[in-house]
Amino acid sequence: MHNNLVNIYKDYIAIIGAGISGLTLGIVLKKQNIPCIIFEKFPSISEYGAGISISRNGQKVLKEIEILDKLKLISGNPKNAYFISNNKEITSFAIDHVTTSRKVLHSILLEKYLELNGEIKFDYQLINIDNQKKLLSFSNSKNLYVDHIAACDGIKSICRNLLSKDKLDPVYSGYSVWRSIINEKQNDVRFYLGPNFHVVTYPVDDNKTSFVGAFKRLKSTEESWRTLGNYNELRSDIPGYILDKYPSIKHNKEIFKWGVYTRTDMGNMYMDNITFLGDAAHPIVPFMGQGGCLAIEDSYIFGKLLIKYRNDIKKTQSIYHDIRYSRVKKIRDDSLNQATFNHLKNPLLIYIRNLLMKYTNIIHILTKKVWDYDPKKEIANINNQ
């Protein structure tokens, strides 16, 4: 081992994974000149064709890292959301989401990180971590000491598998999701609720729409992470009267079916010299549209804490856990409950749900605390203590 090569990043925060959480963390750190480097296992970055919705809480971070305006210009900016049950509109309300594709968000984050002279290493597949020595070993035979490890490597986190004693492997949630980006123009968000399924559609730009169809299926053995499907399979899970509203989906060659996976428990958000962010820390079912926003929040808050307590990683981790754990757990639990709420089968319960949605502010109550959350204020509160 050449010592100079092994030690080249010993003062750096090592970010494992160049996804949304990894790039966001990299930007937050680079803006304050904190040495960091991203290690990505793939030879290049390729985000899949799926939509992502960013509510106010996530937008506050994107504004702070100076990419929100650019994202808005090339994304959807729906102002209203409509809820439909049994092909009839129940209610609608005003929203201020940015709806886009993961690919677009990812490319803007990457561009910003590189603009800040951020360093990223491709083809660096992690195979071992010595958490006491903070030594990373990769499949390309490189071994590198680092200052701290930020695990941003998703639900199938190699970092967690290598280190965590809780061994919480991802488990099938009982839900699967059809996803596609289709050639349809739409200006609003539409939720179609039905027995054992729901569909969400929203614009990702001026000409394309994200289609997400979630359904309940208890056969976990056949549910892979992601498979290429076709229109006939989609039609067996999602009613034709909804699909007929989006005729271009019939000819779409990229219709993917995802098994929705989670963990039975959240597990640790940090251990020794490693901290978990995003899906590596807390995968959630996507039924409140908060997976991406929570990852963005994690990265902003952990990054700001690293900057504030640069020489006290234990304090950084402890405060990160205290700030994040209860919020994430609440949204995680509420997301599962939302699936049940969306997929009611009993006609009486459906009738009651629809009345509640139409004549009360239940949606506002369920979403206000989630969307109004301000990561900047969270950090400011610490500064004022």
Task: Name every feature range the model reports, one short phrase each.
Residues 12, 35, 208:
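Residues at the starts of beta-strands that form the adenosine-phosphate
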Residues 170-175, 187-188, 224, 231-232, ...:
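A short coil-to-beta-strand element that immediately follows conserved catalytic motifs
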